[in-house]
Amino acid sequence: MNEAPTAADRSFFRTLKILIVEDSTEMRRLLTALLESMGVGEILEARDGEKALEIFAAQRPDIIITDGAMQPVDGYEMTRRVRAAGSAEGANPDIPILMISGHVGRENVNHARDEGVTDYLAKPLSASTLYEAIVAAVSKPIHFVDKPGYRGPSPRRKLEPRQPGGDTRT
């Protein structure tokens, strides 16, 4: 972050409930520390997509931040299942889902897009990149209008992995 979060940011972030889905203990700790520094009110954790789906159904997070590669249910499959969840089940299938991955090739980005990921962030992840992605996700949700089952308006945009420090490698 170029600047410290404003009082308004901190006030808003205190209202957020964010679910981290990551099999690496170190990465979960890092993401938790980053989110705490932003003032996020409630941080939930899951080690894989299977546990995340249980937490999603029971706890109703506002945002999901997930890794792509996990077992037994990876971030792609978890995203597909979240998007398929009906509002009749009390779930929000349009929840912002941010995927963090070290795999930034076009095939991975397209796969994430096809499964309904809101934004794709490249590792290593900077605090400013995560902060900007969260603000963008809650300010004006970006989903894919060509994704079957999406119920809300959204601008079309090309999904590109966000690179820390302006790195443009793919």
What kind of feature is each model-predicted range?
Residues S11, S139-T170:
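CheY-like receiver
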Residues T25-L44:
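Two-component/phosphorelay signaling modules centered on CheY-like receiver
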Residues E45-E54, G75:
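Helix N-cap/capping motif at the beta->alpha junctions
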Residues Q59-I65:
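Active-site beta3 strand of CheY-like receiver
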Residues M70:
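Receiver (REC) domain active-site loop signature in two-component systems and cognate sites
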Residues E107, L125-I134, V138, I142, ...:
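C-terminal output helix
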Residues T118:
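Short, glycine/charged-rich "phosphate-handling" switch motifs in NTP-dependent
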